[in-house]
């Protein structure tokens, strides 16, 4: 029995949800998001809420129940508030600069790294060591953050690299003489 799946997803005012075909589409002040529906789950759009129930009592349906409810919640949160991830750059000479739909990274390579920002994502650099990634699709925001971080993951000796805000970097002691 899913404790998460039991709760209905509340739809705030200004947000509309509709099921058409095999898609659930949610429209709000920040935009429109859609997701394909699972055959193992029953979705019901009522007044002010979306409820998610397993279609049958199979193990797979019960396993998907809580996850599908959370995906629906992420759609509603995305079109109302949006999602943000913050990356921090540590290291001498490491910096970032957002220029329109392009992010220029200087990460200690012999060349600058140019990252093309996908549609639906907004990137800001409040200072040259902080990158703010925001958008309405939680999966896409996380994917873009992971792709940027992949260029220079934090190393365990000095902690140089790109890390998520709040991420703990396991540090190692250097060689002893």
Swiss-Prot record:
The molecular function GO annotations come to: rRNA binding; structural constituent of ribosome
Give UniProt keywords alphabetically. Answer: Ribonucleoprotein, Ribosomal protein, RNA-binding, rRNA-binding
Please provide, in alphabetical order, the Gene Ontology terms of the cellular component aspect for this entry.
cytosolic large ribosomal subunit
Listed under GO biological process in this entry are: cytoplasmic translation
Q: Which domain of life is it from?
A: Bacteria
Looking up InterPro entries in the UniProt record yields: Ribosomal_uL6-like (IPR000702), Ribosomal_uL6-like_a/b-dom_sf (IPR036789), Ribosomal_uL6_a/b-dom (IPR020040), Ribosomal_uL6_bac-type (IPR019906), Ribosomal_uL6_CS (IPR002358)
Under SUPFAM superfamilies, the record lists:
Ribosomal protein L6 (SSF56053)
Which parts pass through the membrane?
Answer: none
The text of the family note is:
Belongs to the universal ribosomal protein uL6 family.
Summary of the function given for this chain in its UniProt record: This protein binds to the 23S rRNA, and is important in its secondary structure. It is located near the subunit interface in the base of the L7/L12 stalk, and near the tRNA binding site of the peptidyltransferase center.
Give the multimer and partner information. Answer: Part of the 50S ribosomal subunit.
Please give the name of this protein: Large ribosomal subunit protein uL6
- Tell me which species this is from: Sphingopyxis alaskensis (strain DSM 13593 / LMG 18877 / RB2256) (Sphingomonas alaskensis)
